[in-house]
UniProtKB/Swiss-Prot annotation:
This is Large ribosomal subunit protein eL33A. There are 2 genes for eL33 in yeast. The gene is RPL33A. It is found in: Cytoplasm. Component of the large ribosomal subunit (LSU). Mature yeast ribosomes consist of a small (40S) and a large (60S) subunit. The 40S small subunit contains 1 molecule of ribosomal RNA (18S rRNA) and 33 different proteins (encoded by 57 genes). The large 60S subunit contains 3 rRNA molecules (25S, 5.8S and 5S rRNA) and 46 different proteins (encoded by 81 genes). SUPFAM superfamilies: Translation proteins.
Length: 107
């Protein structure tokens, strides 16, 4: 039997983009596992992100739902990236895992 391979890299939803007094929920900050520099983070620009969660009500035979987004640019010097989602991620997802898919590929 063929070995299964993950098509995504794990990441954490850190926070919204913010300043001293104002936060911007349109832009989420994502820390990608194994990425420590802005140069490493460049690879992930344009990649798709999914926040997968379980809901209490079943829709079309499944309780699992997904919120989709995209990596837009890097943020800071520690390899964090900015991402926008079709619907903003709720604040209760701070610290939650997200999946950064390895497509669309630009290699």
């Amino acid at each position: 039997m063929a070995e299964s391979h993950r098509l995504y890299v794990k990441g954490k939803h850190l926070s919204y983009q913010r300043s001293k007094r104002v936060n911007n929920p349109n832009v989420s900050l994502i820390k990608i596992e194994g990425v420590a520099t802005p140069q490493d983070a460049q690879f992930y620009l344009g990649k798709r992100i999914a926040y997968v969660y379980r809901a209490s009500k079943e829709v079309r035979g499944s309780k699992i739902r997904v919120m989709w987004g995209k990596v837009t640019r890097t943020h800071g010097n520690s390899g964090v990236v900015r991402a926008t989602f079709r619907n903003n991620l709720p604040a209760k997802t701070f610290g939650a895992s997200v999946r950064i898919f390895l497509y669309p590929s630009n290699i």
